[in-house]
Design a protein with these regions (language model features):
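Short gly/ser-rich loop at a beta-strand->alpha-helix junction or flexible surface loop bordering the NTP-binding
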Residues: 1-178, 317, 327-340
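Surface segments flanking catalytic/ligand-binding clefts of nucleic-acid enzymes
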Residues: 150-340
Length: 340
């Protein structure tokens, strides 16, 4: 439902509730069969109308549950302020922050991290993703080559609806191990990413060794580098914008997708930009989909980044390659991609 709202509006237009109203909604929520009208659910994006799926409803106590075919229940007696939004009169949804916590508790912390990264980025997936309700969409596939996954898995350009700081503040008042574990991962979230593959790349290079990442963060995304006179003369540009800039390493990490980079004009622009950055003493590495699936190559790139930071690359995690591959495939699943 949240993805459907972002696709249709470009943002979330739902109404915030004050804490008293949130408690009242949770306390009095007790839906019956008569309250669940499929056309309305399809209209607001809570159901597709084409795929048989369970509807998950939140109530404040076990006594509020009802035996309804096709409905599963989640029970929570209390939620922090800012957990519930009003979709329309009588219909409510978890906020982006609360949804991330729910996914962390019910599915896993990395899956919740991936969802949080999507919500912090300028993308919204179609609902073919594994961890939110399915939704059939004819959107053109923008993720990779057509052979890599079905053509109806794609993404939409929208505005972010969450920030890492907002999520961290919310998690600070949440109870439970899942919330605390997700809170520890908030510093590794990035903002304003523009494609699912950028999200996967930044997660791999930012997350700690213990999760299967390369511990190269933090990165500044959409970072504007002003060129000096020499760099301007060489590149013909006043500045460059880096996808992911590691300031301590003076290192720019770029994802080179199929769109916008394969044309002659795109190649010339990238060459000028990269030459200008190199003139400024900034090393540039370009990663594509094939390279991102090669953990040995990515670890060599991470080693170079650590070297530029004047640090030793010390990944002493047992079976580290298996952890790295498991992290990659978990992230790919979250963004609707096949495992490698």
């Amino acid at each position: 439902m949240m993805r459907a709202e972002r696709r249709q509006m470009g943002y979330i237009s739902w109404k915030d509730l004050d804490p008293d109203e949130e408690r009242r909604v949770l306390r009095t929520s007790s839906p019956s069969t008569e309250d669940i009208y499929l056309p309305d659910l399809v209209r607001i994006g809570a159901a597709s109308g084409e795929v048989q799926e369970d509807l998950c409803l939140l109530v404040g106590s076990a006594a509020q549950r009802r035996r309804i075919l096709g409905v599963s229940w989640s029970v929570c007696s209390g939620l922090p302020a800012g957990s519930i939004l009003e979709v329309e009169p009588g219909v409510y949804s978890l906020s982006p922050e609360a949804l991330c916590v729910a996914v962390a508790r019910e599915v896993g912390c990395i899956q919740a991290f991936a969802l949080a990264q999507e919500l912090c980025s300028k993308i919204s997936l179609s609902d073919r993703g594994k961890y939110l309700p399915p939704y059939t969409s004819p959107v053109t596939n923008k993720l990779a080559k057509d052979k890599d996954q079905p053509a109806d898995v794609g993404y939409f350009e929208v505005e972010p609806v969450l920030t890492p700081d907002r999520l961290a503040d919310y998690l600070a008042v949440c109870k439970g191990n899942a919330a605390k574990q997700l809170q520890r991962l908030c510093p590794y979230l990035s903002e304003n990413l523009r494609s699912p593959m950028e999200c996967i790349m930044l997660a791999l290079f930012s997350l700690p060794f213990s999760y299967g990442g390369f511990a190269c963060g933090p990165f500044k995304t959409d970072c504007k580098i002003e060129f000096d006179d020499r760099a301007q003369a060489i590149s013909g540009m006043p500045h460059a914008v880096c996808d992911a800039y590691q300031e301590a390493a003076r290192f720019d990490l770029e994802y080179n997708g199929e769109l916008g980079h394969s044309s002659r004009r795109g190649r010339i622009h990238d060459e000028k930009r990269n030459t200008g950055l190199i003139t400024m003493g900034i090393e540039v590495a370009t990663v594509n989909n094939e390279m991102l699936c090669d953990m040995e190559a990515m670890e060599a790139l991470a080693w170079r980044m650590h070297q530029r930071m004047r640090k030793r690359y010390r990944n002493r995690v047992d079976a580290r390659r298996k952890k790295q591959e498991a992290l990659l495939n978990t992230l790919r699943a979250c963004f609707g991609l096949k495992p490698v």
